[in-house]
Amino acid sequence: MNLTEICDNAKKGREYALLGNYDSSMVYYQGVIQQIHKHCQSLRDPAQKVKWQQVRQELAEEYEQVKSIVSTLESFKVDKAVDFPNPVPEEGPRDPDVWPPPTPAEHRGPVQVKKPVPLSKPQRKESPGMQHRGAVGRGQANIKPDRPNTRDGRGNKAKEEKSKRNAQEGAADVEQKKFDGTGYDSDLVDALERDIVSRNPNIHWDDIADLEDAKKLLREAVVLPMWMPDFFKGIRRPWKGVLMVGPPGTGKTMLAKAVATECGTTFFNVSSSTLTSKYRGESEKLVRLLFEMARFYAPTTIFIDEIDSICGRRGTSDEHEASRRVKSELLVQMDGVGGAQESEDPSKMVMVLAATNFPWDIDEALRRRLEKRIYIPLPTAKGRAELLKINLREVDVASDVDLTVFAEKIEGYSGADITNVCRDASMMAMRRRIQGLSPEEIRALSKDELQMPVTMEDFELALKKISKSVSAADLEKYESWMSEFGSV
């Protein structure tokens, strides 16, 4: 991707907007936005990617401003066409007793002359190149004939034609990426489009300690099919579904956020509230619409957190007819995903990523469709030490703190429990400093007085206050289920 070409197109779009040539300006803006989008997909550095996304957002705002100007000018044009003929016939018969002036004849003459003038002016202005500014100031009907004259005046015709071609291709791509919700309620389409994670969750693989097997599997299921589409065909098609199983607080949702940040696919964040409605039959439509939108925006990852609340075991006594229909539609749509097997392009895939704390409550048919079922366990000793370093990287730690030794003491704690311990320990110094002070004295404290390093004693006190949230019996249930139904 030529960065100079991106800068030139952005500059030309702004120049055309300043000159009033809004039609050409919109073409350049659409092209440069699409070029930056393609450039972001090729970047691997997250910091550079975020900067380019900010630039793209600024250009998109400028493009919207130009569009609003064009729509305003078009409304003026329509108003003039409507307002001109109306007062003309009303002026004549207003005073029948007075000798009629010759104004009606004079009004009719110019109206008839003005009608063919806009049609003939562009034909006369195709040849001269010095009159294009006047045409731009008078209306947009004269913009298109001015493009070749502007290019010839600048003397870089080949470069301009290439930029125009790229801009038009970018505009076509932007138009293609708008989902057509014909046949569905517009409110349902808007509700699902809001669940597309467009902003960056800012969670990277390095922010998650341990869990190397889970990271490797998610890269294989989401990233590699886009990098090697020729390899992932036939029996080696990408995985259609991945289920993350484990006790609460072990990082299942964090892994999903990392997938949304790192993998560059369209990411749908779906919960039970997204797919439920009080109207009969609307929940099934939402499920079908979700997968149709996912196939349209492919490659796509659909993350369903706490999937046991949506697709529990069928045939139980507390099951309702409406929930059974939703489960059936979800199972049908998941079985029909099969993007890499049926599509010509294996990278146009739809992968369902699910997480649950109760895998034994999931329906058997859904368990079959989630081809990979991985266990997200409690962190190991190495993982606990890494978690302590990640949580304390913005806090000053005293020299007497040995994180490796403390990691051995918190065996059996989940990732969320370790985060709570670190948060409580980092606040111990502040609690000691404000003890016995009045509110006025607390407000008068400086920031440096509160920034005290965390000591080993603070960690010991926090550990006494916070107990682990996962019992040994729960771990045995997860391990028993994984030994019977696991698929790593």
UniProtKB/Swiss-Prot annotation:
One of its GO terms (biological process) is anatomical structure morphogenesis. ATP binds at G246, P247, P248, G249, T250, G251, K252, T253. This is Katanin p60 ATPase-containing subunit A-like 1. Regulates microtubule dynamics in Sertoli cells, a process that is essential for spermiogenesis and male fertility. Severs microtubules in an ATP-dependent manner, promoting rapid reorganization of cellular microtubule arrays. Residues 84-184 are annotated as: Disordered. Its EC number is 5.6.1.1. It is found in: Cytoplasm, Cytoskeleton; Cytoplasm; Cytoplasm, Cytoskeleton, Spindle pole; Cytoplasm, Cytoskeleton, Spindle. Keywords: ATP-binding, Cytoplasm, Cytoskeleton, Isomerase, Microtubule, Nucleotide-binding. HAMAP family: Katanin_p60_A1 (MF_03023), Katanin_p60_AL1 (MF_03024). Belongs to the AAA ATPase family. Katanin p60 subunit A1 subfamily. A-like 1 sub-subfamily. It comes from Danio rerio. It catalyses: n ATP + n H2O + a microtubule = n ADP + n phosphate + (n+1) alpha/beta tubulin heterodimers. Pfam families: AAA, AAA_lid_3, KATNA1_MIT, Vps4_C. It is an enzyme of class 5 (isomerase). One of its GO terms (molecular function) is microtubule severing ATPase activity.
